[in-house]
Amino acid sequence: MQMPRPTEEDKARFRSLVPDDPRVQVRAMFGNLGAFLGGHMFAALLGSDIGVKLPAAELAALRERGARPFGPTGRGMSGYLTVPEGDDAAELLARAAAHAATLPPKATKR
């Protein structure tokens, strides 16, 4: 299976949607991008799809609006959904970052 690759425009759009917060890091991951806060990935770019990690109740509401599983296999990564067309992606990424901020920071790797 080949991993979807984003265009430079996709990458620029993703970066523009990530909250402007000094705690947030955008890092390359397998040719795609991930947004992290406290070591927790809260959003990712896979090809042209943007996925967010939100609390279960918010994921359920997002599913009702047409969100589909997010991940390279089509099966989906646990806790992540693809931002549906027409949704306010910047708002969803901000909510995902706020959720990540409530989690204890992950230990840094040496």
PLM features: what roles do these ranges have?
Residues 1-110:
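Charge-dense, helix-prone N-terminal extensions
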